[in-house]
């Protein structure tokens, strides 16, 4: 569970200005 949360947080951080969710 923690691993998935960390991954989602990383995705959010990467989405600082790039459409990672769309990638």
Curated annotation (Swiss-Prot):
Return the GO cellular component terms, semicolon-separated: mitochondrial inner membrane; respiratory chain complex IV
A single GO BP annotation from the record?
Answer: mitochondrial electron transport, cytochrome c to oxygen
Which GO molecular function, any one, fits this protein according to its record? oxidoreductase activity
Q: What UniProt keywords apply to this chain's record, in alphabetical order?
A: Membrane, Mitochondrion, Mitochondrion inner membrane, Oxidoreductase, Transmembrane, Transmembrane helix
- State the compartments where it is located: Mitochondrion inner membrane
Membrane topology of the entry: Single-pass membrane protein
Q: Which family does it belong to?
A: Belongs to the cytochrome c oxidase VIIa family.
Assembly state and interactors? Component of the complex IV (CIV, cytochrome c oxidase), a multisubunit enzyme composed of 14 subunits. The complex is composed of a catalytic core of 3 subunits MT-CO1, MT-CO2 and MT-CO3, encoded in the mitochondrial DNA, and 11 supernumerary subunits COX4I1 (or COX4I2), COX5A, COX5B, COX6A2 (or COX6A1), COX6B1 (or COX6B2), COX6C, COX7A1 (or COX7A2), COX7B, COX7C, COX8B and NDUFA4, which are encoded in the nuclear genome.
Q: Which function does this protein serve?
A: Component of the mitochondrial respiratory complex IV (CIV, also named cytochrome c oxidase complex), the last enzyme in the mitochondrial electron transport chain which drives oxidative phosphorylation. The CIV complex is the component of the respiratory chain that catalyzes the reduction of oxygen to water. Acts as an assembly factor that specifically drives the homodimerization of CIV complexes, mediating the formation of mitochondrial respiratory supercomplexes (respirasomes) containing two CIV: supercomplxes with two molecules of CIV show improved activity.
| Name of protein | Cytochrome c oxidase subunit 7A1, mitochondrial
> What is the organism of origin for this protein?
Canis lupus familiaris (Dog)
